[in-house]
């Protein structure tokens, strides 16, 4: 059980760090604008070496930002629950700590999937036509890696929960 929780905690730490970095950085998309290199993130866009805040309130940016922040918060609370799961005495007999941590990591995975799906859909259908020479960049890719890490953290914690439940049910009362 503890090896699964340890693996889950490792994946969770890596996934949460990647979520925060992906959300905060400005390299979701790279393109050429009037022959100059440009890139944009969720909060700023940069032309050459000069960066500007994205002041427009565009729905897909707001949705992507909100879901990335929700994903980071779920992953952080999952880490806290995952650390507490190492404690021996459960405070609630009906609520398993590894199960709760696993659910939080799956919620984080769901939110980052929503954020990346929205961003991908709008970028490919609208911005891809606007900018001829463009590509997704490393911040966007970190978001997908974070999705995998939070998903595997949830899997590890669910495996730890199942092992604990099987042991609990097999011991005589």
From Swiss-Prot:
InterPro entries: LMIP, PMP-22/EMP/MP20-like, PMP22/EMP/MP20/Claudin, PMP22_EMP_MP20. The modification Phosphoserine is found at residue 170. The keyword Cytoplasm does not apply. PANTHER family: EPITHELIAL MEMBRANE PROTEIN-RELATED (PTHR10671), LENS FIBER MEMBRANE INTRINSIC PROTEIN (PTHR10671:SF9). GO terms for cellular component: plasma membrane. The chain crosses the membrane at residues 4-24, 67-87, 99-119, 141-161. Present in the thicker 16-17 nm junctions of mammalian lens fiber cells, where it may contribute to cell junctional organization. Acts as a receptor for calmodulin. May play an important role in both lens development and cataractogenesis. Eye lens specific. Predominantly monophosphorylated on Ser-170. Only about 15% diphosphorylated on both Ser-170 and Thr-171. Its main location: membrane. This is Lens fiber membrane intrinsic protein.
